[in-house]
From Swiss-Prot:
NCBIfam families: glyS. It is an enzyme of class 6 (ligase). HAMAP family: Gly_tRNA_synth_beta. Its main location: cytoplasm. PANTHER family: GLYCINE--TRNA LIGASE, CHLOROPLASTIC_MITOCHONDRIAL 2, GLYCYL-TRNA SYNTHETASE. Tetramer of two alpha and two beta subunits. Coiled coil: none annotated. This is Glycine--tRNA ligase beta subunit. It catalyses: tRNA(Gly) + glycine + ATP = glycyl-tRNA(Gly) + AMP + diphosphate. GO terms for molecular function: arginine-tRNA ligase activity; ATP binding; glycine-tRNA ligase activity. It is found in: Cytoplasm. GO terms for biological process: arginyl-tRNA aminoacylation; glycyl-tRNA aminoacylation. Keywords: Aminoacyl-tRNA synthetase, ATP-binding, Cytoplasm, Ligase, Nucleotide-binding, Protein biosynthesis.
């Protein structure tokens, strides 16, 4: 078995492309190996800040053979009346370098059928690797040199080998070789003897090509620091992944900043150090002034540590200045400054948005029938929920939006419940009732406002994150079990921006509700379709979906489905529900009618309590009565009055089933 290597060397990759390249290499390698008929035991993908590529293990000597077929002329044209090949057939064979031995007859035509031997892998791999490299997609590709080529970053070298042999490959005007390059400024060219020794060869040049090994190396150094220092480092997965993406040989740097900055709120310190210097803060019961960073390359000299300390101290000094300045201004005054900050050009300022959030929040409180005293807390929180956007700290550290609002509110002595809601309403899963109300109001205003000015998301573009905001609204409603009319809230919010609730906006929310049910709750496609019309009252749709999903996985679903199906199939083109029980002639009609009235009362009471599981169990009770009815009663009799009366009666049962969900969308399960 053979091993192949492809390495593409480039200028520094943006960290934002790291996971995309990794995923594409994995997917496209598998696709291309299949397309080129090459079986591979395993595919190793690697991505670093200055290189990416693949190692293909356990390759065969050759491609797999395949049977080639080509359609030729019809049989009546290919042969004469004596069964001899005509000129048409002879020309077809000659043009395809084939003989009569390769001819088969099928469906009235001549076909060429011949086994084509696979080529040696070293002949095929150059094309496969070229397709792989050129088949990658990037968010923001760039041109370089004469502008002839476009790629994520300028490409400087290519290594392409099978075993110890260099492949004949040229891309971007560069010919492949066995020469790679180590860490810039620390190592020059590195000769790769063969793919098996690729990783160890690069390590000599301070490059760990495998992203998995780099991550392991980072975590090992953190573990070692903790054992040595007795301190703890929070394993921030996002930061660790970023370090892995931007380094090729991450080495730990331990430094410290001035202890005076520990007087700042912890959130400011962590943000300044993490987001702006990609460093961790060490803990020992409480936050310490020790930080851990990662330098790319060999063991960092002392001046590197000093450099980190100088930059972090400067950032924290700036943060302290901004924080102290902010403390001189109340949230109320910050809120007034929102009049100078545009939310969106056609939707006014952030102050205007806050006013709309207050009105939507009040309407939501009314819908939820919340006490007046609690409603006042909600409105107080709403009035300052965006105030910190005007603060100096948030201007410098936008990721602290909401966090600083809570901190400043507590410093002013504002009720903790209100202060917490300022931060909480930004969360995709708010933990407080006030935060949940503000979270819904804020997101509804943003979605409705954007639709009002024509910023409608598409399947591929959603620059304002409206889909995610809609999903969060459904998530909040489910968590709090709020039986509210989303349609009425949207209509009210629309009136605040002089917009009429459009079919386009309704379609958007219906679509997001469908995706929410499937992606977040694990509801099957047919059940999601069955309840999708209930998006206007999301909690009911969610509870109905969960109940239907649960019963669809049990044997009794058969009784529910068959009972509904027998009734619905015969009444689907009938509209009236007016019937006269006095016209019933058979005992089975009367028994089903009596059972229907009994079940209907139970179902309606269960639905009043939003107990869809119970409602479904009651509906199942109808199944034997429905079966008995259809076994003994002929519905489509010639007498118009009897036929219409029976259809109208059955239509009542059909509509009772439909109260739980549109069961016409349900797919029959295999269980019995």
């Amino acid at each position: 078995m053979r091993t192949a290597l492809l390495e593409v060397g480039l200028e520094e990759l943006p960290a934002s492309e790291f996971h995309s390249i990794l995923r594409q290499l994995e997917e496209k390698s598998a696709e291309l190996l299949k397309a080129y008929r090459i079986s591979s035991g395993s595919v190793e993908v690697f991505v670093g800040s200055r290189r990416f590529g693949v190692i293909l293990n356990n390759l065969p000597e050759r491609q797999e053979d395949f049977t080639e077929e080509k359609k030729g002329p019809p049989l009546n044209i290919a042969y004469d009346e004596n069964g001899k090949p005509t000129r048409a057939l002879e020309g077809f064979l000659r043009n395809n370098n084939a003989s009569l031995e390769n001819v088969v007859h099928r469906e009235g035509y001549v076909y060429l059928s011949r086994v084509v031997e696979g080529k040696p892998v070293e002949e095929v791999l150059p094309d496969l690797f070229r397709d792989l490299v050129l088949g990658l997609n990037f968010r923001k590709p760039m041109r370089w040199g004469s502008g002839e080529h476009e790629y994520v970053r300028p490409v400087h070298w290519i290594v392409a080998m099978v075993d110890g042999r260099v492949l004949d490959l040229e891309i971007f005007g560069l010919r492949s070789s066995r020469i790679s390059y180590g860490k810039r400024y620390h190592a020059g060219s590195i000769e790769i003897p063969d793919p098996e020794r690729y990783y160890e060869s690069l390590k000599k040049g301070f490059v760990i090509s495998s992203h998995l090994e780099r991550k392991k190396f980072v975590l090992e150094q953190i573990d070692e620091f903790e054992k040595r220092s007795g301190m703890k480092i929070e394993r921030d997965e996002e930061l660790i992944e970023e370090i892995v993406a931007i380094t090729e040989y991450p080495r730990i740097v331990v430094g410290q900043f001035d202890r005076k900055y520990l007087e700042l709120p912890e959130e400011i310190i962590v943000t300044a150090v993490k987001h702006h210097q990609r460093s961790f803060i060490a803990h020992k019961e409480t936050l310490t002034n020790i930080f851990v960073a990662f330098q790319d390359g060999p063991q960092p000299p002392e001046n590197v540590v000093k450099g980190y300390e100088r930059v972090i101290n400067a950032r924290l000094e700036d943060a302290r200045y901004y924080f102290q300045k902010d403390l001189e201004t109340s949230l109320e005054k910050m809120n007034e400054k929102l009049k100078e900050i545009v939310f969106q050009e056609k939707l006014g300022t952030l102050y205007d948005k806050v006013e709309r959030i207050k009105k939507i929040s009040q309407r939501l409180c009314e819908d939820l029938k919340l006490p007046e005293m609690f409603t006042q807390k909600v409105l107080e929180a709403a009035s300052i929920c965006k105030a910190d956007i005007a603060s100096k700290v948030v201007y410098e550290f936008p990721e602290l939006q909401g966090v600083m609002g809570r901190i400043y509110a507590l410093r002013e002595g504002i009720n903790e419940e209100i202060a917490t809601a300022i931060e909480d309403h930004y969360s995709e899963e708010p933990q407080t009732v006030i935060g949940s109300i503000l979270g819904i109001a804020d997101r509804i205003d943003t979605i409705v406002g954007n639709f009002a000015i024509g910023n409608v998301p598409t399947s591929s573009k959603d620059p304002y994150g409206l889909k995610s905001k809609a999903d969060t609204i459904f998530r909040i409603i489910r968590k709090n079990e709020w039986d509210i009319s989303l349609e009425e809230l949207l209509t009210f919010a629309s009136s605040l921006v002089k917009y009429h609730l459009s079919e386009e906006l309704e379609t958007f929310f219906a679509g997001r509700f469908y995706q929410f049910l499937i992606n977040e709750l694990g509801i099957s496609f047919d059940v999601a379709r069955a309840v999708n019309h209930l998006w206007k009252k999301p909690l009911r749709g969610i509870l109905s979906a969960e109940a239907l999903q649960e019963i669809s996985e049990k044997p009794e679903f058969q009784d529910l489905f068959v009972g509904f199906e027998r009734v619905h199939n015969i009444t689907k083109n009938h509209d009236s529900t007016k019937f006269d029980g006095a016209l019933f002639e058979k005992e089975e009609e009367k028994k089903l009618m009596n059972k229907f009235y009994e079940v209907k009362e139970k179902v309606l009471k269960a639905l009043e309590r939003l107990n869809y599981r119970e409602a479904l169990q009651y509906l199942i009770e109808l199944k034997p009565y429905i079966d008995e009815y259809f076994d003994n009663v002929f519905v489509m009799v010639k007498r118009d009055d009897l036929r219409v009366n029976r259809l109208s009666f059955l239509k009542n049962i059909d509509e009772l089933f439909m109260m739980v969900g549109d069961m016409t969308y349900l797919v029959k399960r295999s269980q019995v």
